[in-house]
Every structure is written in structure tokens, then in C-alpha cells.
């Protein structure tokens, strides 16, 4: 599910978060499509593993942090966001937590984000949706996910699949949580 997990930094962030913020201290997972300052954004691929680290958080990550969200880590995804199944040939395919007895796909391309939320590891999973990359894994993992209006959240700092169709969005376990995150 997680390609990078930074529990120590998350604990420090949580301790420093103001309790009055809407996401105060809640764990946030970030799809490996979004820039996080100091980290490489590889879009689920090994080709970009040696790319330069991001100089700043993308606007979506910055907004979640400003709302008190604590970045737990960077999640697995379909390579270059180019499938709705959720498989990644380099990092493995996260198992759909709805039925762990049988290895079922979680849907994609935001597969790791969905699994992180469905297992309770994260309150919200930041992802993207071009042709179903939030809606498909949300449906397969029993979560809430929708494709918001284009540009409702800036796409700068996100690896593009389609610059005219990409949207930034998140998955949660309830509609109430989705409203809190998207406000």
C-alpha cells in the first residue's frame, strides 16, 4: 500500500498540529503522483525513481497540511495512472481489504490510497481522477470517492495523465468525511 512511510515525521507533525483545524492530527496518504517537498514523485514507475526531489508540496498536499492533516506516506498506484484495475508491475498490487481471503484488485489508479483508507491506516487518501482513478477504487473498496469539477483543486505539482481531464480528489470512509476534506 505504502511506497514510503514516515511514521516519525508524522508523529512530529501530529504533535505540532493545532486542535482547532478541521483535519487536526488525522493521517493522510498521498498518491505517488503528487509532489511532496524533498521527495521524488515517481508516478508508480521505476523510470522516475532517480528524478529530482520536489522543491515544494503541490497545492493539494499543502492544503491538507494547512487543514491539520498529517502526511503518513506516499501510496502505491498504477504506473503513470494508466489503468483502472490497480496493478503495478514494479511495486506489487495492493490487496483489496474487503476480501483478504482472495487476492482481489482494489481498482485504480489510486489503488494504494484506497487501501490505506479502507484499512484505517489513513483518514483520507489523496488521489487523482481522469477516467475513474478515484471512483473505481472507492467503489471496489467500499469508500466514498467522486470526481470534482475540473480545477476545483489545482493540478500543479501532479504528474499529468491528461492535462484537460485530470482532477485532484480524495477518498474517505464516509460522505461526512468527504465533505470535511473537500471544504
Annotate each PLM feature:
Residues 1-130:
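Gly/Ser-rich catalytic/binding loops embedded in alpha/beta enzyme cores
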Residues 87, 115-183:
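Fold-level recognition of mixed alpha/beta catalytic cores in primary-metabolism enzymes, strongest
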Amino acid at each position: 500500500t505504502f511506497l514510503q512511510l514516515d511514521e516519525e515525521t508524522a508523529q512530529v507533525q501530529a504533535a505540532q498540529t493545532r486542535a482547532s483545524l478541521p483535519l487536526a492530527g488525522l493521517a493522510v496518504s498521498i498518491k505517488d503522483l503528487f509532489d511532496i517537498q524533498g521527495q521524488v514523485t515517481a508516478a508508480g514507475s521505476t523510470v522516475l525513481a532517480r528524478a529530482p526531489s520536489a522543491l515544494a508540496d503541490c497545492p493539494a498536499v499543502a492544503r491538507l497540511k494547512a487543514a491539520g492533516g498529517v502526511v503518513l506516506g506516499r501510496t502505491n498506484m498504477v504506473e503513470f495512472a494508466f489503468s483502472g484495475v490497480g496493478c503495478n508491475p514494479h511495486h506489487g498490487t495492493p490487496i483489496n481489504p474487503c476480501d483478504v481471503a482472495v487476492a482481489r484488485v482494489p481498482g485504480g489508479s489510486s489503488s494504494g490510497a484506497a487501501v490505506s483508507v479502507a484499512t484505517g491506516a489513513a483518514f483520507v487518501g489523496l488521489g487523482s481522477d481522469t477516467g475513474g482513478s478515484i471512483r473505481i477504487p472507492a467503489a471496489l473498496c467500499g469508500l466514498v470517492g467522486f470526481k470534482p469539477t475540473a480545477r476545483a483543486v489545482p493540478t500543479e505539482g501532479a504528474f499529468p495523465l491528461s492535462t484537460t481531464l485530470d482532477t485532484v480528489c480524495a477518498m474517505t470512509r464516509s460522505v461526512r468525511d468527504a465533505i470535511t476534506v473537500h471544504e
